[in-house]
A protein has these predicted regions:
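Catalytic phosphate/metal-binding cores of nucleic-acid and nucleotide-processing enzymes, i.e., regions
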Residues: 63-65, 85-86
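Multi-bladed beta-propeller domains
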Residues: 36-57, 89-109, 158-174
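Polybasic, low-complexity, intrinsically disordered segments
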Residues: 1-19
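Hydrophobic beta-strand positions that form the internal "hydrophobic ladder"
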Residues: 70-71, 122
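A flexible loop/linker signature enriched in serine peptidases of the S9 family
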Residues: 54-57, 73-86, 104-110, 125-154, ...
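Residue-level detector of Asp-centered blade-edge/turn motifs that repeat once per structural unit
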Residues: 65-66, 117-118, 182-183
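Blade/loop signatures of beta-propeller domains
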Residues: 24-47, 153
Length: 183
């Protein structure tokens, strides 16, 4: 199983655990008092796990084919974004005090990035051509995240400097969640 799938599954587990704690509980306890261990009792597959993002909703993280970089989506407002955008990190980075490199346009909402086999390009879905503003976000139900489905997503290929080099779709519909075969 590729690391990217393990990262994605682990992110969902962490996301659910974090969302069960309310901000008041977190603010009233020191870091030592909080359970900062990122593994779960009985976990036998994850080792040496470290937190790499601090704040915002971070998801859809995937490793490059050479395992040197990770691409992920985030809406962390401290990074100057209002809705999900694509970010890049090297495998030894952490973003507690610095902003990662943005690969998407910074306009519209983006989702579902994935490395191309050359490790020099990614693909991702974005609504930026239909509207440069963030589309309306669905209301959370009982505090839970609701996945937005927009018919204005199209799929793009960009280089690691954030330049779009091609557009792969051009029709109304939910064009997102693409993946790439390594060959």
């Amino acid at each position: 199983m590729r690391k990217s799938k393990l990262v994605k599954r682990h992110n969902k587990k962490i996301f659910k655990v974090v969302k069960k704690r309310d901000d008041e509980t977190i603010a009233s306890k020191s870091k030592k008092e909080l359970n900062t261990d990122l593994s779960f009792e009985g976990e036998k597959y994850f080792k040496n796990i470290k937190q790499i993002t601090f704040g915002g909703d971070n998801a859809e993280a995937y490793w490059s084919f050479d395992d040197k970089q990770l691409v992920f989506q985030s809406n962390h407002n401290k990074w100057g974004v209002e809705c999900d955008q694509m970010f890049l990190m090297d495998n030894d980075e952490s973003f507690e005090s610095i902003t990662p490199k943005m690969l998407s346009t910074g306009k519209g909402r983006t989702t579902c990035s994935y490395f191309m086999p050359d490790n020099k390009h990614i693909l991702y879905a974005s609504t930026h051509e239909a509207n440069e503003l963030c589309p309306e976000t669905p209301l959370r139900v009982d505090g839970n995240y609701v996945w937005p489905i927009y018919d204005t997503y199209d799929i793009y290929v960009a280089d690691l400097d954030g330049n779009i080099v091609s557009k792969l779709t051009n029709q109304i519909g939910y064009d997102a969640e693409a993946t790439v075969s390594p060959n």
